[in-house]
Amino acid sequence: MNNYSISAKKKFSILLRLMKNLKFSTVPPLVENDVTIQDPLIKSNIFNSFFASKSTVPSSNDQPPDLARNDGVPSLDSLNTSPIEIAKIIRNIKKSQISYCGISGMFINLISQPISQSMSKLFNNLFKIGHFPDLWKIAHITAVYKRAGLKTSKTSYRPISILPTLSKIFESVIHERLLAHCMENSVITDKQAAYLKGDSTTHQLLYIVHTIRTNWDINKIIQAIFLDVSAASDKVWHNGLIAKLNQIEVDGNFLNT
């Protein structure tokens, strides 16, 4: 905003757009034990207890299985980033996205060039020591209506974590390296659908339909088992996940980060 080549009118226009993107939503009164709750703090505590009860994870003392390492896969133990990569990641942040500290995606996009250099230096120093700042792990949880059920019931809402912008950019760098490592070394099965570029659950659905029709044509019996893991992302067994990462040769400061 200190760029004086931008007119005052243009600066004011940018500020208005930034303010316009700051949208806040409220949860209607909740009914708990036949009592209508309107106090925001009490509603927050109700959601906190409910979401926490649905996100239990295995004990940290549970020992993961002893998995043999894949010696044919090269080790992924360090990484570096660059201002160009950071700027690219920032450009992909949705402009309407707001972090819990109130920084919008639009604002980050506007200052992407001057901050990319400093950000890449910071990230590279963190990668060298294998450290992920504790403050970046703290998320603000907001309750989002599922579009099903009574709006007065806590069970009709799901939790959404709003992380700091720096945390999300840092995670994006790690994700790109880990995904590339898995793809280049055929770690991910070709039956995986979604979470991959150029693939989606639509492809998986087409595969299932094709398999069913092909077997019908030759009078074969078709059987399928569908599993739905409730709150899967909230119940990640971290010790088991680390064991799996070790198995595919992810270690060193990359794993520590």
Locations of the language-model features?
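Acidic/histidine metal-binding catalytic segments
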Residues: 251-257
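Conserved catalytic palm subdomain of right-hand nucleotidyl-transferase polymerases, strongest
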Residues: 94-103, 152-162, 203-246
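Short, glycine/acidic-rich hinge or "gate" loops at secondary-structure transitions
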Residues: 1-6, 186-195
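Surface-exposed loop/turn segments and immediately adjacent short secondary-structure elements
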Residues: 9-155, 161, 165-169, 185, ...
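Conserved short loop/turn motifs at secondary-structure junctions
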Residues: 103-111, 192-197, 226-232
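Active-site palm subdomain of RNA-directed nucleic acid polymerases
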Residues: 174-192, 222
